[in-house]
């Protein structure tokens, strides 16, 4: 014959209810608890790891903002320096062209001959040299 299984008798602690609870009363009590909850109690619900993670996230965002601003200012300073260098370079080129033109005008053979004649010098072909 088959033996009967032993039944366990579990006793659950069930509170005795005097009056039935209405669902609207439960919602009101839940709302009251949340509305009177202090911010410090809300912060206590956040774990230490989450707090550290939030602080690190905020610090990294602030760091990225600061670094971005520094990079932008560095870029603008570099661009200004490049522009100044280009302007100086252009001025030097213009000055160089101007001086070369002046040199070529001053070193023309006709001009040298006319100045020599004014000074009372005579022209001897053997003593003339080309000016470069």
Curated annotation (Swiss-Prot):
<feature type="topological domain" description="Cytoplasmic">
    <location>
        <begin position="1"/>
        <end position="50"/>
    </location>
</feature>
<feature type="transmembrane region" description="Helical">
    <location>
        <begin position="51"/>
        <end position="71"/>
    </location>
</feature>
<keyword id="KW-0131">Cell cycle</keyword>
<keyword id="KW-0472">Membrane</keyword>
<comment type="similarity">
    <text>Belongs to the FtsL family.</text>
</comment>
<dbReference type="GO" id="GO:0043093">
    <property type="term" value="P:FtsZ-dependent cytokinesis"/>
</dbReference>
<keyword id="KW-0812">Transmembrane</keyword>
<dbReference type="Pfam" id="PF04999">
    <property type="entry name" value="FtsL"/>
</dbReference>
<keyword id="KW-1003">Cell membrane</keyword>
<dbReference type="GO" id="GO:0032153">
    <property type="term" value="C:cell division site"/>
</dbReference>
<keyword id="KW-1133">Transmembrane helix</keyword>
<dbReference type="GO" id="GO:0005886">
    <property type="term" value="C:plasma membrane"/>
</dbReference>
<comment type="function">
    <text>Essential cell division protein.</text>
</comment>
<keyword id="KW-0132">Cell division</keyword>
<feature type="topological domain" description="Extracellular">
    <location>
        <begin position="72"/>
        <end position="132"/>
    </location>
</feature>
<dbReference type="InterPro" id="IPR011922">
    <property type="entry name" value="Cell_div_FtsL"/>
</dbReference>
<protein>
    <recommendedName>
        <fullName>Cell division protein FtsL</fullName>
    </recommendedName>
</protein>
């Amino acid at each position: 014959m088959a033996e009967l299984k032993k039944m366990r008798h579990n006793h659950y602690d069930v509170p005795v209810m005097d009056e039935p609870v209405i669902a609207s009363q439960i919602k009101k009590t839940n709302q009251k608890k949340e509305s009177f909850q202090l911010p410090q109690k809300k912060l206590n619900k956040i774990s230490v790891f989450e707090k550290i993670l939030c602080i690190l996230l905020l610090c990294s965002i602030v760091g990225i903002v600061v670094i971005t601003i520094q990079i932008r200012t560095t870029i603008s300073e570099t661009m200004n320096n490049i522009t100044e260098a280009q302007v100086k370079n252009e001025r030097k080129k213009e000055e160089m062209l101007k001086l070369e033109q002046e040199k070529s005008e001053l070193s023309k053979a006709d001009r040298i001959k006319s100045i020599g004649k004014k000074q009372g010098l005579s022209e001897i072909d053997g003593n003339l040299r080309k000016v470069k």
